[in-house]
Amino acid sequence: MARYLGPKLKLSRREGTDLFLKSGVRAIDTKCKIGQAPGQHGARKPRLSDYGVQLREKQKVRRIYGVLERQFRNYYKEAARLKGNTGENLLALLEGRLDNVVYRMGFGATRAEARQLVSHKAIMVNGRVVNIASYQVSPNDVVSIREKAKKQSRVKAALELAEQREKPTWLEVDAGKMEGTYKRKPERSDLSADINEHLIVELYSK
């Protein structure tokens, strides 16, 4: 399955919530009719069955993190194998992706931009270049921008945007050095309440 390359706001309208696919700190519901379905007239969304609600939640989370269907299912299987709450394990695995950590640290304005930085070999983990977006960052790992990439205007612009966002408590970032430490895995209370991971567990448990 190919990665979606179409209009980002269209996806957010389809899911009925901001998927944080666009750069900036202003919520996109001020830019577009987030409550309406995509299309010229924004037809009213049909009432969904329980399965439909579960499927929409899975699609929403998958799109937030920019993960393809097969990858997402594999994350769920891994989360189910781990000790603890499967839904919380799933979110922790998604948050631990290198592209997401780069975004959370403020080096990329969006997860897509952070993924591009990783694939272009602009990111190091513990002093070594890693160009795999799905690489799982471990507690106490140091993530940094390569020296030759520090002058990129998009990195500087992303850091300026990050100053306006709430800083994740599980990360420690030195914007001047363009590096940060993944102190710990985020707890459920650290993450968005707009995500209902229980619906995803119910979907895959069938």
From Swiss-Prot:
* Family matches, as SMART domains: Ribosomal_S4, S4
Keywords attached to this Swiss-Prot or TrEMBL record, sorted alphabetically, are: Ribonucleoprotein, Ribosomal protein, RNA-binding, rRNA-binding
Q: Which GO terms describe its cellular component?
A: small ribosomal subunit
Q: Name one GO molecular function term.
A: rRNA binding
Q: Report the residue ranges that make up the S4 RNA-binding domain in this protein.
A: 96-156
Q: Which PROSITE patterns match?
A: RIBOSOMAL_S4 (PS00632), S4 (PS50889)
Q: Does the keyword Plastid apply?
A: no
* Signal peptide interval: none
Q: What does the record give as the function of this protein?
A: One of the primary rRNA binding proteins, it binds directly to 16S rRNA where it nucleates assembly of the body of the 30S subunit.
Q: Cross-referenced NCBIfam families, in alphabetical order? A: PRK05327.1, rpsD_bact
Q: What is this protein called?
A: Small ribosomal subunit protein uS4
Q: Which organism is it from?
A: Salmonella typhi
- Organismal lineage: Bacteria, Pseudomonadati, Pseudomonadota, Gammaproteobacteria, Enterobacterales
Q: Gene name?
A: rpsD
